[in-house]
A protein has these predicted regions:
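Flexible glycine-rich beta->alpha loop in the catalytic core of nucleotide-sugar glycosyltransferases
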Residues: 104, 111-112, 155-156, 162
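A short acidic/small-residue loop/turn micro-motif
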Residues: 67-68, 108-109, 141, 159-160
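Domain-scale signature associated with acetyltransferase and cell-envelope carbohydrate enzymes
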Residues: 1-106, 128-130, 147, 163, ...
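Short coil/loop residues immediately preceding or within conserved phosphate-binding loops
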Residues: 122
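Conserved catalytic-core motifs of eukaryotic protein kinase domains, centered on the activation segment
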Residues: 110, 117-118, 143, 177-179
């Protein structure tokens, strides 16, 4: 299989010397924009961070992705629509056939220290296969999203999402079970 790292015009990359990109497919940072935006995509990889691409993944304009020291971001197949924001302090894993809409935020850390016993600053995030994440969703640390799930627009996901469900709300709660969805493209 051929692996490619495709960067179109509006892309900015800051990679530490010890950062690694593992390509087992193609990743494309796209500047396709139907609204005439001049927003660039940014990828910052700090010391010893790893970006792994398992298949083919597209990232549209306005992405803002940071992998902090020692963090790992693993992408299966699918796409991030415009203005995705990812803050990876530890580990974020995204499965195959995943559709993530615009203005989504995914953070595996609170980005600050808690002052109480048992507080954990970071917890990994895992997003399963065949997942559809709607516009302006926020996914917070420690969440696992099961296969074939749908996250409704505007939701804040603070707890695990079971397979074959639709969740919605702030915080997100299961509103439908035993669902199945397919692409209509």
């Amino acid at each position: 299989r051929k692996s490619k790292f495709i960067c179109l015009k509006k892309s900015n990359f800051q990679l530490a010397k010890s950062a690694k990109i593992i390509l087992n497919g193609t990743i494309m940072f796209s500047d396709n924009d139907i609204n005439g935006s001049t927003r660039q995509s940014n990828l910052r990889m700090d010391k010893d961070s790893i970006l792994e691409i398992k298949k083919n993944f597209s990232i549209y304009y306005g992405a803002d992705i940071i992998l902090f020291k020692g963090a790992k971001l693993k992408l299966g197949s699918g796409f991030f629509n415009s203005n995705i924001k990812i803050r990876c302090h530890e580990k974020i894993e995204i499965g195959e056939n995943v559709a993530i809409s615009h203005d989504v935020t995914i953070m595996d850390s609170d980005a600050h220290e808690g002052l109480w016993e048992g507080y954990e600053k970071t917890k990994p995030i895992k997003i399963g296969n065949h997942v559809w994440i709607g516009t302006r969703v926020t996914i917070l640390k420690g969440v696992t999203i099961g296969d074939n799930a749908i996250i409704a627009a505007g939701s804040v996901v603070t707890k695990d999402v079971p397979n074959n469900t639709v969740v919605a709300g702030v915080p997100a709660k299961v509103i439908k079970i035993n669902i199945n969805w397919k692409w209509i493209i």
